[in-house]
Amino acid sequence: MEKEKFQQKALKQTKQKKSKSAEFLMVKEERAATEGIENPAFNISSTDLSAYQTSEEEVIRHDKLHSTLAAHQQKLRLQAHAEPRGNEYSRNYFDLLMDEEINPRQCGMEVSEEDPVKFQEQILYGKLMKLLDEASKIIDSQVPVTGEDFSDSVMPVSFSKTRDLHRELGDEAIPSYIEQFEREVQNDIIMFGSFSLEQDSKHHKEASHHNKKNCNPGFMSSFKDREASRWQQR
């Protein structure tokens, strides 16, 4: 019986201790919630405050980081604001229009159906003029050709190139003024080989005529008599 009483007493004491400790903890938590967490830096009883004080260098560094972050965020905001929002904000309205964006109907320049044809004719005419210039440069720089090379140089350079140009064009209609231009130019072109042959034949005729004039008639008659006597001896 005594043992049981002693055990009941011990259990009561332990229960009372546990309840007191729980009450103490609850009161402490309520105080911390109402008064706030105590900052050791402002505690007067604590003598060592150096552990809780931040140095000036750390404060300056912290301020620098804050300033750089703020500047970076501001820069990002400006870039996002400056980015185009669709086609209407892609370019400033005060900028000059590009060539491909100019509408001729808005500017009062009506495009007729004949303009592309005229443009192609101008291109062909420019190509022909360029070929003729090249041919004239070759004629000026080339040495006169002899009679043996006549077959290679009879065809002018410009006509071979115009033929290639006609092949490139294919089935496209060649304007009439280009054909007329070729006919007129063909009459004025001097063939390389024919020009050299005419010079050689003219020079040969002049030389033979000059020799005939300079020959002595007495010498010719004596030469004929000698040839006749030689034939009689045979």
UniProtKB/Swiss-Prot annotation:
Residues 1-21, 201-234 are annotated as: Disordered. Pfam families: OFCC1 (PF15680). Residues 223-234 have a biased composition (Basic and acidic residues). Disulfide bonds: none annotated. Residues 202-213 have a biased composition (Basic residues). InterPro entries: OFCC1 (IPR031390). This is Orofacial cleft 1 candidate gene 1 protein homolog. It comes from Gallus gallus.
